[in-house]
Curated annotation (Swiss-Prot):
Sequence ranges of Basic and acidic residues compositional bias: 24-41
GO molecular function: dGTPase activity
Gene Ontology process terms (BP): dGTP catabolic process
Keyword 4Fe-4S (UniProt): no
Signal peptide region: none
Stated name of the protein: Deoxyguanosinetriphosphate triphosphohydrolase-like protein
NCBIfam families on file: antiphage_dGTPase (NF041026), dGTP_triPase (TIGR01353), PRK05318.1 (NF003701)
Similarity comment text for this entry: Belongs to the dGTPase family. Type 2 subfamily.
HAMAP family, per database record: dGTPase_type2
Keyword Hydrolase listed: yes
Pfam families: HD (PF01966), HD_assoc (PF13286)
Domain HD: 72-285
Length: 461
């Protein structure tokens, strides 16, 4: 934001509105249950079937190829640890320095005002535990395959499925999912827009739809980011305590679509979500690099370009440490590599700071966490290296292709005779659903499978 766009900041201590602890359904604690609301949310997520299923879902590599690889479950646990560390760091005075200069307000005053906004450990861990539970089997390949099959019924995307599981599918209640607090749900919404609006406009593109899943140009069907239109009722409830101005601003896209093949991305997210997303990015960039090194997917020669890029970044810490970090990353001594990984994670965590987003009335939207510009560039180098040498690795891509082919074929088979081939409960839901939502029932069933379960079902068919 420009300084001339900033409205006057009221320096009274901020108090979180009680509506953020409301649930969609009345849900008083059980007798003698004195847990605060976000601890109850954490327990529901931690004990859910959707969370347990993460132990058998791919982070990047196929489950069973190597026991060292992280699954989405171990990844989520590490994201929670980093998220809690970021929250602790954001309490320190130094993290208010940049915001103090932006607002021309003493950083001590900002610290007093804004610290109460920070999520509790229960809340940030809830978000980090939940952030990946909507991802289907076989990672982004599975996600794109399901989007291809659902393109005419609102599409499919992992973050949208996460919101759907939390608010509808997980059987803690009959029709409201886990019935989590409003603030927890706000924290998992990375992209506050409808998926069928944010995604490429497939009806205008006329992409070929090959009935044989082996020959689908799957790259054409990468989804945008958002919420399913089927879940609009819960999304509207989530935002109903915001002012009209805040709702409109919160759901804005970064730009206007220039061609139908373009995906649109929203501009804003909540404070809690920004912390969770930073934790996810740090875990992705650093821990997935560790997986790749340990299992021999990458070597020091491939790392040289990234090493050179990191040395060009105007960071005193990187200039002083990146040579030894790079050497220790590829050391034969496991403890040296572990020390290097720990040093990198600490570098990113200790460079977090407060940021003003826009003139929101709601303080949970007005402020975000961010990394300083040079540290953002550094994290981007790590993420790009993982993308280039791990995700785009031919073995990874073949596993992903195999997975997307299996999911596409399974979807077609289930759709051809659902009452015969779907499990009884799923078949009953399919039978009772209106015509326009029947495919969503099949999609929910497939998306909820682990990699191993999907493989077993495919082999049965």
């Amino acid at each position: 934001m420009q300084k001339n766009e900033i409205k006057q900041i009221d320096m009274k201590p901020l108090i979180i509105d009680s509506s953020w602890t409301e649930r969609f359904l009345p849900d008083p604690p059980r007798e003698k249950d004195n847990r605060p609301p976000f601890r109850r949310d954490r327990g529901r997520i931690l004990h859910s079937a959707a969370f347990r299923c993460l132990q058998a879902k791919t982070q990047i590599h196929s489950i069973g190829e190597n026991d060292f690889y992280r699954t989405r479950l171990t990844h989520s646990l590490e994201v929670a640890q980093i998220g809690s560390s970021l929250v602790a760091q954001l309490k320190f005075l130094e993290t208010f320095e940049s915001l103090s200069q932006t607002l021309n307000i003493d950083k001590n005053e900002l610290q007093k005002q804004l610290k109460p906004l920070l999520p509790s450990n229960d809340l940030i861990e809830s978000l980090c535990f939940a952030h990946d539970i909507g991802h289907p089997p076989f990672g982004h390949g599975g996600e794109t395959a399901l989007n291809y099959m659902m393109a005419e019924q609102g599409g499919f995307e992992g973050n949208a499925q996460t919101f759907r599981i939390l608010t509808k599918l997980e059987p803690y209640t009959e029709n409201a999912g886990m019935n989590l607090t409003r603030r927890t749900l706000l924290g998992v919404v990375k992209y506050p827009a409808l998926l069928d609006v944010a995604s490429p406009q497939y009806a205008e593109l006329n992409f070929s739809r090959n009935i044989d899943a082996r020959f689908v140009r799957i790259h054409d069907w990468i989804p945008g980011k958002g919420i399913f239109r089927d879940d609009l009722k819960m999304f509207n409830w989530l935002l109903e305590n915001l002012s009209e101005n805040d709702r409109t601003l919160f759901c804005q896209f970064k730009k206007v679509r220039e061609n139908p093949a373009e995906s649109l991305h929203t501009r804003f997210k909540s404070l809690d979500c920004s912390i969770m997303e930073l934790a996810d990015d740090i875990a992705y960039g650093v821990h997935d690099l560790e997986d790749a090194i340990v299992t021999g997917m990458v070597n020091p020669h491939q790392w040289q370009a990234a090493h050179s890029a990191l040395k060009q970044i105007p960071s005193a810490w990187l200039h002083e440490n990146i040579d030894s970090i790079s050497q220790r990353l590829f050391s034969d001594k496991h403890f040296e590599r572990k020390q290097a990984i720990g040093a990198l994670v600490n570098f990113f965590i200790t460079n977090v700071r407060w940021k003003l987003t826009a003139n929101f009335d709601e303080p949970l939207l007005r402020y975000n966490a961010e990394l300083s510009p040079e540290v953002i560039v550094a994290l981007g180098v790590f993420k790009k290296f993982v993308w280039d040498y791990v995700i785009r690795n031919v073995d990874t891509q073949r596993i992903e292709y195999k997975g997307q082919r299996m999911l596409t074929e399974m979807f077609q088979i289930f759709e051809s005779d659902p009452e015969r081939l779907l499990p009884r409960n799923t078949a009953n839901r399919w039978r009772n659903a209106p015509e326009e939502r029947k495919k969503r029932i099949i999609c929910d069933y497939i998306a909820g499978m682990s990699d191993a379960h999907a493989l077993r079902v495919y082999q049965q068919l």
